[in-house]
Regions:
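Pocket-edge structural micro-motifs
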Residues: 7, 152, 246, 268, ...
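Active-site flanking residues adjacent to catalytic metal/cofactor-binding acidic residues
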Residues: 172, 245-247
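Rhodanese-like catalytic fold shared by cysteine-dependent sulfurtransferases
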Residues: 209-242, 250-285, 290-333
Length: 333
């Protein structure tokens, strides 16, 4: 089955020193392109036969491997961001200066690095060695050797056997150039200020106990009916008459001129004023910016009023990342 777009696991507007614009561009363009290209490569692989030249098969399999790595590493990278608003002096997950690692993390890595400070110095130096170039820096845990180490992955596909990355830093220039230019050192420092240590510690526990990878999709915590952007695209293609509601907050809409093609913007704070404009016997798909609370809450209200409503996982950002069509808002056109 095709690789689906994973909803972004962090609220881009909550990061400290990293702009929402850069994170969204990274997600929609770079991550989205990796998913779309992976699906295209797999479609081509499915058409090959015994007459396919060996070099063509070899090239496609290498490309598939690299793209699989890019997709996974991007998802993990976004998933370990967002700690600035979660951690604090009294949370047990951070320190007042935002530069010390939490005690629980230090306890995990000290045996392999000597101290948390020594780990951080090596991780930072490794990242700085990639400045101006490209690649990933990973803190990886080897299940076979029962130890952590920092590694470089320069083409998305340099993964160790039976090992799992638990902290990921994207050092490709697209990850920081928009905000930091060539100042990779400032980006690395800002990255540390935004690490979601809670997510990192959960990954460590999952890996060490040989449990399946965590589902870091923010919509996985609700039982409100939902659909993926791929499922929404199928509904549209099948002519189901789905009504698409853009429920992004007014202040968010004031900064954007586009919306999903076929959608109508509705103020999420004034559902009672526009709900009568919907057709009761047709399905409704509701999306917000990134698939967190807003679209989910509007969907709950519509369901309570008898509508067959679902919220779109990942919001409009996931739709754009999938290559979905967009249109100008009527007021902006």
């Amino acid at each position: 089955m095709p690789q689906e777009i994973a909803p972004i696991a962090v609220r881009p507007s909550t990061l400290s020193g990293i702009s929402e614009q850069m994170v969204v561009s990274h997600y929609e363009n770079n991550y989205g392109n990796a998913v779309r290209t992976l699906n295209a490569v797999r479609r081509e692989l499915a058409t090959l036969d015994a007459g396919t030249p060996p070099h063509r098969l070899r090239g496609l399999k290498r490309e598939e491997h690299s793209l699989m790595g890019s997709v996974a590493l991007h998802e993990l990278y976004f998933g370990n961001l967002g700690g600035f608003r979660r951690a604090g002096p009294n949370s047990g997950l951070g320190r007042p200066d935002w530069h010390e690692v939490p005690d629980a993390f230090a306890a995990e890595i000290t045996a392999d690095f000597g101290s948390a400070s020594a780990w951080r110095r090596e991780f930072v130096r490794t990242a700085q060695s990639l400045a101006g170039g490209s690649g990933w820096v990973l803190l990886t845990y080897s299940r076979r050797q029962k130890r952590f180490w920092n590694q470089i992955a320069t083409d998305h596909s340099q993964a160790a056997v039976d090992a799992a990355p638990v902290l990921i830093l994207d050092m490709y220039e697209h990850a920081y150039h928009m905000d930091f230019g060539v100042n990779a050192a400032a980006y690395i420092d800002t990255f540390f200020r935004n690490i979601n240590w809670e997510a990192v510690l959960k990954r460590i526990a999952t890996t060490q106990n040989d449990r399946p990878p965590l589902n870091e999709d923010p919509s996985s915590t609700t039982d409100t009916p939902s659909l993926s952007v791929e499922e929404l695209a199928a509904h549209i293609a099948n002519g189901s008459g789905v009504q698409i509601v853009d429920a992004r907050q007014r202040d968010h809409m004031s900064r954007h001129v586009d919306l999903m093609a076929g959608a109508t913007w509705r103020d999420p704070d004034r559902v009672e004023e526009w709900i009568a404009e919907l057709t009761p016997d047709k399905p409704v798909a509701v999306y917000c910016a990134y698939g967190f609370d807003v679209g989910c809450n509007v969907t709950k209200t519509l369901i309570e009023r008898g509508f067959d409503a679902r919220f779109v996982r990942g919001g409009v950002a996931a739709w754009y990342a999938s290559g979905g069509a967009r249109a100008l808002r009527p007021t902006a056109g």
